[in-house]
Amino acid sequence: MNGIRDVVKEEQPRERLLLEGAGSLSNRELLAVLLRTGSKDETVLKLSDKILHHFDGLRMLKDATLEELVSIHGVGVAKASQLIAAFELGRRMVRLEYQNRYSIRSPEDCARYMMEEMRFLQQEHFVCLYLNTKNQVIHRQTIFIGSLNSSIVHPREVFKEAFRRAAASIICLHNHPSGDPAPSREDIEVTKRLVECGRIIGIEVLDHIIIGDHKFVSLKEKGHI
């Protein structure tokens, strides 16, 4: 016997990870490492397959709720909590790269900063990035969750945080859960209202970015700002 090398089999993804590295594992094997054990009826890899099939792959799984996970036979609160915590850590690690006073020089910079966090959201989220005079992000805040319209997104809520943070300018973003970032009439109306308020109080609204699935639209580039 040669120790750990002799126990590397298909049903032992953790041992494969130790010997070959995490990059060599499939999605089902990585999920099995997080789950640690299967149930009395199935192996951990079979449980991984069932979870991935239930959510049609990683895209939907990463946003799974506790209730959705525990509805799967073999997944209890402990396993569900482990998965939710792992996915949240992954999201935070993606953000970490950009959080150290990330500078925004173009709509592409802004979309890159928020794309992975916003493109899979199941509801519309209206988010503001608050910038200093060097166009560095000093704060961001979700202002509203739900269908965007001018009666709900109130300038008071947008600019209140700008004053608190002594922001020089603002970039607004929201996502389209459909994946299509084409602006609606309401999107344009909200944008024009915020831009006008910004002019009056001296805090410029630089852009309004609509996030789709790996696509975005800048309302400034479209001529609406």
UniProtKB/Swiss-Prot annotation:
Domain MPN: 103-225
Keyword set, alphabetical order: Hydrolase, Metal-binding, Metalloprotease, Protease, Zinc
Presence of the UniProt keyword Ion transport in the record: no
Listed GO MF terms: metal ion binding; metallopeptidase activity
Chain positions of motif JAMM motif: 174-187
A Gene Ontology biological process term: proteolysis
Family matches, as PROSITE patterns: MPN, UPF0758
InterPro entries referenced in this protein's UniProt entry, alphabetically: MPN, RadC_JAB, RuvA_2-like, UPF0758, UPF0758_CS, UPF0758_N
Pfam families cross-referenced by the UniProt entry: RadC, UPF0758_N
Residues where Zn(2+) binds: 174, 176, 187
CDD domains listed in its UniProt record: MPN_DUF2466
Family annotation (PANTHER family): DNA REPAIR PROTEIN RADC, UPF0758 PROTEIN YEES-RELATED
Family assignment from sequence similarity: Belongs to the UPF0758 family.
Protein name (Swiss-Prot/TrEMBL): UPF0758 protein BCAH187_A4587
Species the sequence originates in: Bacillus cereus (strain AH187)
Lineage: Bacteria, Bacillati, Bacillota, Bacilli, Bacillales
